[in-house]
Amino acid sequence: METPSIDIQNIRAKYLNSHDPYLLESKLPTTSPFELFDIWFRNVASQSDLTFEEINAVSLSTVGKDLRPSSRMVLLKAYTPTGFSFYTNYTSRKGNQLEENPNAAMLFYWPKVNRQIRVEGVVEKLPDEMAVAYWNSRPVASRIGSKSSDQSKVVPDREFLESKKVALTELSVREGAQAITKPESWGGYHLIPRYFEFWQGQSDRLHDRIVFERDVDVWLLKRLSP
């Protein structure tokens, strides 16, 4: 495979942070990483078209007992002062890896504001009643899509999935959306952080990296060289 004609080596974007040009310890609005995440998330939300931009999309990295890491994008569905929640299939590759090893990492990247946030911690399953409540709040088309797919399992072709979708759609028409119940293998996870890294890009590549690391019951703050 040949390198594309695009000059990849010389792609260098200009980073513009007009409101907060530098991430300085003396000017942090809070010493809580959860509060700083909230501030940054609200900031990018205020500058985004949420109809087309999924600012809650996050790269989730997991490692099973075979020590082979894997990453994929998932959608963050809630964040609280204790951590970050998402929903998926428990028998998917990520679900199996989390069962074997609950340590995981998240990476949020928002190029519009030249910022990214890394979060590392331990993942726990959310209570099933929370998963049921969220499942029932979803559009019926989303429920049908999720229930049509035994995530990460090999299927013969797309028609196999489409036939399951058609059957479930017909069921929902006959009996209502409540007939599309949550599968036992589907539920939520909550990542409880022990490490945050807030990164703000700079055009001269002297980027800002501020870390919060959990030490018993306090967060230690430090700056890393870019």
Curated annotation (Swiss-Prot):
Cofactor names: FMN
Binding-site positions, pyridoxal 5'-phosphate: 16-19, 77, 134, 138, 142, 205-207
Signal peptide: none
Pathway involvement of the protein, from the record: Cofactor metabolism; pyridoxal 5'-phosphate salvage; pyridoxal 5'-phosphate from pyridoxamine 5'-phosphate: step 1/1; Cofactor metabolism; pyridoxal 5'-phosphate salvage; pyridoxal 5'-phosphate from pyridoxine 5'-phosphate: step 1/1
EC number: 1.4.3.5
Matching InterPro entries: Pyridox_Oxase, Pyridox_Oxase_CS, Pyridox_Oxase_N, Pyridoxamine_oxidase_dimer_C, Split_barrel_FMN-bd
Uppermost EC category: oxidoreductase
Single Gene Ontology BP annotation: pyridoxine biosynthetic process
UniProt GO molecular function: FMN binding; pyridoxamine phosphate oxidase activity
Bound cofactor: record note: Binds 1 FMN per subunit.
A Pfam family the protein falls into: PNP_phzG_C
Record: residues binding FMN: 72-75, 87-88, 93-94, 116, 151-152, 199, 209
Keywords annotated in UniProt: Flavoprotein, FMN, Oxidoreductase, Pyridoxine biosynthesis
Oxidoreductase listed as a keyword: yes
Top-level taxon of origin: Eukaryota
Reaction(s) catalysed by this chain's protein: pyridoxamine 5'-phosphate + O2 + H2O = pyridoxal 5'-phosphate + H2O2 + NH4(+); pyridoxine 5'-phosphate + O2 = pyridoxal 5'-phosphate + H2O2
Family per record: Belongs to the pyridoxamine 5'-phosphate oxidase family.
PANTHER family assigned to the protein according to its UniProt record, in alphabetical order: PYRIDOXINE-5'-PHOSPHATE OXIDASE, PYRIDOXINE-5-PHOSPHATE OXIDASE
Subunit: Homodimer.
Reported function: Catalyzes the oxidation of either pyridoxine 5'-phosphate (PNP) or pyridoxamine 5'-phosphate (PMP) into pyridoxal 5'-phosphate (PLP).
Name under which the protein is recorded: Putative pyridoxamine 5'-phosphate oxidase
Organism: Caenorhabditis elegans
